[in-house]
Amino acid sequence: MTVEDTANRPVVLLLDGHSIAFRAFYALPPEGFTTSGGQHTYAGYGFLSMLSHLVTEEKPDYIVAAFDEGSGTFRHQEYPAYKAQRAETPAEFIGQVELLREVLHALGIPTVSSREYEADDLIATLSLTAKNEGMQSFICTGDRDSFQLIDDVTTVLYPTKGVSTLVRYTPEKVKERYNVTPAQYPD
């Protein structure tokens, strides 16, 4: 596929909601990001700042945000120790995700989630669907597992400094950085 072919495709921006919000949660200070009722908002602020930058820079035709629903996915059922070593999600973070989903809804940005699948599974499905429909996908995530999805019409925008800097991973960038093709990138 030529660069011109790719440039003429509609663009869908796929956001890994929890991944981006979690990065913002740890990148920004909580001071000054609290409502009068005590609700923390700094993860949402960082997420929306990144989204604003992405919309300005990438000019997507469509945007979808995928979120995790918890620990009841098929992986947890098949392998109970799946992600068992992870620390408990801070309570200050949980409330911010629901607030962020409300803001995205108000902005007209659809959100998807599933009790059976993680957000990155949903993003993989959406990316493949977009490709089959003649679109190109930009996936914004801090999850390197998504590098396996990269091809001539799928690019991963990976945050490297909190929520302010994104690295564009294409097949060439994956090969340059890791000396493997996206399909060879370990899961």
Predicted regions: what they are:
Residues 27-30, 52, 79, 84-87, ...:
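Short linear sequence elements within intrinsically disordered, low-complexity coil regions
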Residues 2-8, 33-34, 84-187:
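Extended two-metal-dependent nuclease catalytic cores across DNA- and RNA-processing enzymes
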Residues 25, 46, 61, 78-81, ...:
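Intrinsically disordered, low-complexity N-terminal regions enriched in serine/proline/glycine
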Residues 1-64, 68, 74-76:
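Non-catalytic, usually N-terminal nucleic-acid engagement modules in DNA/RNA processing proteins
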Residues 24-27, 75-80, 149-154, 170:
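Short acidic, glycine/serine/threonine-rich loops at helix termini
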